[in-house]
Every structure is written in C-alpha cells, then in structure tokens.
Amino acid sequence: MSPEEELQSNVSVASSSPTSNCISRNTLGGLKEHNYLGLSDCSSVGSSTLSPLAEDDKATISLKATELTLGLPGSQSPARDTELNLLSPAKLDEKPFFPLLPSKDEICSSSQKNNASGNKRGFSDTMDQFAEAKSSVYTEKNWMFPEAAATQSVTKKDVPQNIPKGQSSTTNNSSSPPAAKAQIVGWPPVRSYRKNTLATTCKNSDEVDGRPGSGALFVKVSMDGAPYLRKVDLRSYTNYGELSSALEKMFTTFTLGQCGSNGAAGKDMLSETKLKDLLNGKDYVLTYEDKDGDWMLVGDVPWEMFIDVCKKLKIMKGCDAIGLAAAPRAMEKSKMRA
C-alpha cells in the first residue's frame, strides 16, 4: 500500500472509534445526554440527576395551575393550594386589580407626573384626592357615605344615656304620630279606597259638639207629568216649610208651564203665593211613602218621625190623592210603631 492510502485508513479508524465506543456504552448503560451545544456541565448533570418523582410533581403542578375553576378574572380560587400556585403573590408582590383605596406611593407618583406633564386629571387622580381628603372618622364601611357617618357620630354624642326606659317609651309614643295608611293605587281597589275616605270625611264633618251625627239622607222626589226626578237631603232641612220651599224651586218651571197651558193667568201674573197654593193642595199634593210601602200625606206626623219613616216623595194631583191616609190614621200608625 502506498503511504497516502495508509494515512486515510488511520483517519477513518480514528474517527469511527469514538462513535463505536459511544454506541457500545449507550447500548450497555442506556441512553445518555451529550453536551453538543457546549453548555455548562452543571445543567446537564442537574437535568440528568432529576428523579422521576420530581417530574411527576412538575406534571401535577402544571395540571393544577392550568385547571379551569370558577372565579373572578385576576382572582385566585380559594380551592387551590398556595404551594401549588406557580405565581404566588408573596414572591411577585402582586396587587389587587381594583383596590378600594390607593396606596401613598401611587398618590405621590401620579401627582408628580401630572405636575410635570401639565395634563388634566384622570379618574384615578380624582379618586386619589378623594382618598386623601377623607378624615379619620371614615372607615371602610362608611367611606361611600361620609355625611351619614358624620351625622351618626354627632347624634350619638348628643343623646343622653342616663334616661329611664319608661320615660323614653312615653316620649317616643307622644312625639311620633301613627303611621298613615298607604294609599291604594290601581283599579279596582281605588273604588273601595274612595268609599273608605268618603266615609271617614263624612264622620268627621258630622261630629258636632262631641256627638256623632248621622250621614246624609237622600230621598227621590217625583211629580206627576214631570219628565225628570230630583233628590233631596232631608237632614239638611229642619221643618216642613223649608222642604216645601225647596221643592217649589226645583219644580217651578214645570208648574209654570202647566199653568200656562191650562189657561190660568199668564206667567207675569203668576206669583210665588199662587205657586205655593198649587203645591199645598189646590192642584198638587205632596205625599210620601213610608217603610211599609203606604202613601201618606206630608205633615201628618212630627218632623223627626217623618225623616225616619220617609222613603220617597211624590207631588201628586189633588184628584189622585183623595184616598190617601189622613192625619189621624197616620198618628195611630205612628203610635203603634212606637
């Protein structure tokens, strides 16, 4: 062989010998890491010396850290263990996302920045100044309502403490009026509410000289030939004369028309006295219906009894009122009721 061929064979043997040694070692003792990138030996040694238990712990830690749980964004779930958290607040000095009151360092830094730059205040700056302005009276509970807290503190100081229990209860009852009844809104309860209010107002208005008076007593009044009806309150009158004058005013137009059509003296010649005569008995008679349903002549009983008995009033023609009860019969009937 020539000298050049011998040199090439030696180089090939030398280059193949370490690979063969590595392969033999790997096959005998298992796969091993080699520092191909030229890193430090300590990293390779540390990584090679890691036990399978540590690798299992790492896997469990990563699974716990990435597990989905319920909670607000930025907050750490209470179910997690603090030892398993990859980013602990103690190590990283974490701060809450929305603090109630800012720290003093942030206040100083923000005020210096605004003074240096000359910009307008932001929301955070206004909140910082509000936190600075709060006094020692305010606490975490009442910082949102400082006025109420201040008034409470003042009232607590002013109220005397040495007051007997009986006196305090009596003063409270005398000073505070009873609670008013809540008004009913809506339909149909409005109807009942109005009835109740009207009843109370009527009771208050009817009470005179400490005596509870009775309510209004409305009675229908009709007239033969009249196309309309009227209602009168009998309790608003005190005698028969007032009632007759009121009925004259109610039915004046109808009686005037009747008299003019019958050929009586004209409207100009008809006076109040003639109209009273018409109502008192010449052409028309005033009658009433009692509780038994009998029609009687008005004026046969005393006024108080008439108010209690009367149910309806009717102005009849004289010819139609001939068979009605006379005064003696009405008096006998009233005595029997008494």
Swiss-Prot record:
Residues 1-25, 150-186 are annotated as: Disordered. It is found in: Nucleus. Residues 9-21, 168-180 have a biased composition (Low complexity). Its main location: nucleus. Belongs to the Aux/IAA family. GO terms for molecular function: DNA-binding transcription factor activity; transcription cis-regulatory region binding. Residues 216-318 form the PB1 domain. Induction: By auxin. PROSITE patterns: PB1 (PS51745). The keyword Zinc-finger does not apply. A motif (EAR-like (transcriptional repression)) lies at residues 68-72. This is Auxin-responsive protein IAA9. Phosphorylated by phytochrome A in vitro. One of its GO terms (biological process) is auxin-activated signaling pathway. The keyword Calcium does not apply. It holds the Pfam family AUX_IAA. Homodimers and heterodimers. Interacts with TPL. The gene is IAA9.
